[in-house]
């Protein structure tokens, strides 16, 4: 658990609170939530739709703040995270904790009152999953932390979908499964080129515990397993060819980029270009796949009516 920031820490300004929400990560969370909302059958009042996305963003930001509050000591020992508000001493730990709790609770309450309570319950589960199950229990204990903890980041499209429909059907479950399967190769590619950071602070990431070779093989395995999950919405007839072809091409490219990662070994002075390329593409992949989902939802009917 974190210790308090230095008593001499300056009062945090809004930029520090914003940094607590992990805005770069939140961008992907918000985008997939919007795509889930837009791809869902039916319609939602634009103001309510905006409210639902705002709640998803608040919930993601709140759980991220609680994650940084708990891991401040760990972050201080890692080059990649040492400049965050807590380890750098720009903020008191209690401020970060209280901020995280406040916006997390508010997000669930507003979602339930304004949208529906099923989406609020799923949002609450996502917050607890990330801030408690992943951060406190899984991450410091098992190299499978990313595999099991992947569910935390897989909820947003499901929440967006349920905000519109008010029910859980197969399609939002598949959207959850896509991100769940995408998470291990995405994060393990990162873990390969920041392995020394995790070793230094004692976090049992897969490359640290099981070794580089095992991690590389598992990246390829999960990338291949992602293919049927990504194509499944098309296979069950829930989407058209715009999404289906996009899913095949994008996920095929993802798997192809995993091959050089799986078949090489790090050498002295290695710049880790294949791993960095895969990590970068994995982010682009999720944006493109979910954009194709929305495009399919609105363009397919137009194409069919014009035919």
From Swiss-Prot:
Reactions catalysed: heme b + (2E,6E)-farnesyl diphosphate + H2O = Fe(II)-heme o + diphosphate
Cleavable signal peptide: none
PROSITE patterns xref list: UBIA
InterPro entries hit by this protein: Protohaem_IX_farnesylTrfase, UbiA_prenyltransferase, UbiA_prenylTrfase_CS, UbiA_sf
Pathway: Porphyrin-containing compound metabolism; heme O biosynthesis; heme O from protoheme: step 1/1
Listed GO biological process terms: heme O biosynthetic process
Record localization: Cell inner membrane
Membrane topology qualifier: Multi-pass membrane protein
Domain of life: Bacteria
GO molecular function, one term: protoheme IX farnesyltransferase activity
Enzyme Commission (EC) number: 2.5.1.141
Annotated keywords: Cell inner membrane, Cell membrane, Heme biosynthesis, Membrane, Transferase, Transmembrane, Transmembrane helix
Membrane-spanning parts: 28-48, 50-70, 99-117, 121-138, 146-166, 173-193, 219-239, 241-261, 278-298
Extra remark: Carbon 2 of the heme B porphyrin ring is defined according to the Fischer nomenclature.
Protein family (similarity comment): Belongs to the UbiA prenyltransferase family. Protoheme IX farnesyltransferase subfamily.
Entry function: Converts heme B (protoheme IX) to heme O by substitution of the vinyl group on carbon 2 of heme B porphyrin ring with a hydroxyethyl farnesyl side group.
Protein name (database record): Protoheme IX farnesyltransferase
């Amino acid at each position: 658990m974190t210790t308090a920031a230095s008593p001499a820490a300056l009062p945090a300004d809004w930029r520090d609170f914003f940094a607590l929400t992990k805005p770069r990560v939140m961008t992907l969370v918000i985008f997939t939530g919007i795509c889930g909302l837009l791809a869902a059958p039916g319609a939602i009042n634009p103001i309510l739709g905006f409210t639902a996305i705002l709640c998803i963003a608040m919930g993601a930001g709140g759980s991220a703040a609680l994650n940084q509050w708990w891991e401040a000591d760990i972050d201080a020992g890692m080059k990649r995270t040492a400049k965050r508000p807590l380890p750098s001493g720009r903020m008191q730990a209690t401020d970060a904790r209280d901020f995280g709790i406040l916006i997390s609770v508010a997000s669930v309450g507003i979602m339930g009152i304004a949208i529906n309570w099923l989406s609020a319950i799923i949002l609450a589960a996502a917050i607890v999953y990330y801030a408690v199950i992943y951060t406190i229990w899984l991450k410091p204990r098992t190299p499978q932390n990313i595999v099991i903890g992947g569910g935390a980041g897989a909820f947003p499209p499901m929440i967006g979908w349920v905000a519109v429909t008010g029910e859980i059907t197969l399609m939002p479950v598949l959207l959850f499964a896509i991100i769940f399967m995408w998470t291990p190769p995405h994060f393990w590619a990162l873990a390969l080129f920041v392995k020394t950071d995790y070793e230094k602070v004692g976090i049992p990431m897969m490359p640290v515990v099981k070794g580089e070779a095992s991690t590389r093989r598992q990246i390829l395995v999960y990338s291949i397993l992602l293919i049927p999950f990504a194509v499944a919405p098309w296979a069950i007839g829930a989407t058209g060819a715009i999404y289906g072809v996009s899913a095949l091409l994008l996920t095929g490219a993802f798997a192809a980029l995993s091959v050089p990662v799986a078949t090489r070994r790090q050498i002295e002075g290695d710049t880790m270009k294949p791993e960095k390329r895969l990590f970068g593409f994995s982010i682009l992949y999720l944006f493109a796949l979910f954009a194709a989902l929305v495009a399919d939802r609105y363009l397919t009917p137009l194409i069919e009516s014009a035919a």
